[in-house]
Amino acid sequence: MEGKIKIGPVGTDYSGKKTMVDWDEGSHNGIISQIFLSHGPTGVFSIQFQFMLDDTFFLSSCHGQNTGSMFDVILLNCPHEYITGISGEYLKSDGASGPQIRSLAFATNLNQYGPFGGSSSQSSIWNHEQQFRFKLGKFRQFSGFYGTYNASGLQNIGVYLQPTIVKPTGTRNAEETESNIVLG
């Protein structure tokens, strides 16, 4: 993806296994209107997105299976609400069965959603769980998700960031500011 920064993925890397399915939703413009999650006490089983492009809505493929005991829909106030971060927990053990992405939470410029999936009240030390947090800034820089899944659930997840050019709002240039700081 030209001009985009690929962040992650977090989770387990089973790249040599034939049962893994790679997915990539980074070619969209990053304007997500809905996120669909199947999850349960052991983690996230599937994730799916609805994107908006030129006032038309497109549904992505379902990445995983909707076999969790819980299903949630995150409805964003599109196009005014946009993703500014993603966080959660993943299992850092290549031999474990089940979803390796244990929980997911999403931050937008307007709200916080989640966590969805396994309870963080379980001991992370004994379960080999690791926390992650991708903060994408306060501007609309999110550009998509990617990851892998298998029959057990979501195995890893990452995000794309499209850097935004931000111009300084002050009238002074950097040299003037620096000289005022140094000289008082």
Swiss-Prot record:
InterPro entries: Jacalin-like_lectin_dom, Jacalin-like_lectin_dom_sf. Residues 4-163 form the Jacalin-type lectin domain. Keywords: Lectin. The keyword Zinc does not apply. The keyword Cytoplasm does not apply. Gene3D superfamilies: Jacalin-like lectin domain. Signal peptide: none annotated. SMART domains: Jacalin. It comes from the Eukaryota. GO terms for molecular function: carbohydrate binding. Belongs to the jacalin lectin family. This is Jacalin-related lectin 2. It comes from Arabidopsis thaliana (Mouse-ear cress). The gene is JAL2.
